[in-house]
Design a protein with these regions (language model features):
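Short, small-residue-biased leader/transition segments that mark boundaries at the very start
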Residues: 1-3
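Short secondary-structure capping/junction motifs at helix and strand boundaries
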Residues: 5-17, 38-41
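Structural/interface elements that position substrates and couple domains in central-metabolism enzymes
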Residues: 18-26
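Acidic-glycine-rich active-site phosphate/pyrophosphate-binding loop
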Residues: 34-46
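Glycine-rich phosphate/diphosphate-binding loop of Rossmann-like nucleotide-binding domains
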Residues: 46-49, 54-60, 64-158
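Alpha-helix C-terminal capping/helix-to-coil transition sites in glycosyltransferase folds
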Residues: 160-161, 183
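Rossmann-fold NAD(P)-binding glycine/threonine-rich loop
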Residues: 169-197
């Protein structure tokens, strides 16, 4: 942002929080933009704290949007969410919130992977417990244990026989190698780019 040639703005590119950012960093960007442009524009970035013009629903907005996407897919394909199965790659803000909201609609999440490992339980993982654990451990599942869950190789996440593969990790995780493994009927895209050149 430290430039007189502003490439972001409320009517240009509006940054949002992503990997390794948070509300404080978004507030700093908005503050720096105000210093350079000479005016306070709350719409220059999303994800700011409430005290600096943030939105009450921002933390869960992307995850909730993915819930709506899955609901729409179910309606168009004459399926009920209750009883669907899902595997999730990535359990940061998007993955954890999205998984929690989707799970609460009756979807059984059997596999969750993050940078620390991949957990599997054919009877369904305890997403409520995983959500609480991750949010109290810096959005990390490192050290998480659960009765009935096993740690499986990370690549096995892609080959789970599930209805939905929820991609919420870093971009380009689906590629020629991993796409060949996918059995899911739907890839729910919660990351920035799943690897469009290969899909």
């Amino acid at each position: 942002v430290c430039s007189s040639d502003l490439i972001i703005g409320p009517d240009k590119d509006v940054p949002a929080p992503d990997v390794n950012t948070n509300g404080q960093i978004m507030a700093w960007i908005a503050d720096e933009y105000a210093a350079l442009s000479g005016k306070w524009e709350p719409g220059v970035v999303t994800g700011k704290p409430l005290a600096t013009g943030g939105s009450l629903g921002r933390n869960e907005a992307t995850g909730r949007g993915l819930l709506f996407t899955l609901e729409t897919w179910c309606e168009k394909n004459h399926k009920k969410m209750d009883g669907l199965t899902m595997a999730v790659q990535g359990f940061g803000n998007v993955g954890s919130v999205g998984s929690l909201l989707i799970h609460r609609q009756g979807v059984k999440v059997v596999c969750v992977g993050d940078i620390n490992g991949t957990w599997y339980n054919p009877n369904g993982l305890d997403i409520e417990a995983m959500y609480v654990y991750a949010n109290s451990h810096g959005r990390s599942l490192k050290g998480y244990t659960e009765a009935g869950a096993t740690i499986i190789p990370d690549m096995d996440l892609f080959s789970q026989d599930v209805d939905v593969l929820f991609m919420a990790a870093m971009e380009n995780q689906l590629n020629e190698k991993t796409m060949e493994l996918v059995k899911a009927k739907l890839v729910l895209e919660g990351d920035n780019e799943i690897g469009r050149a290969h899909v």
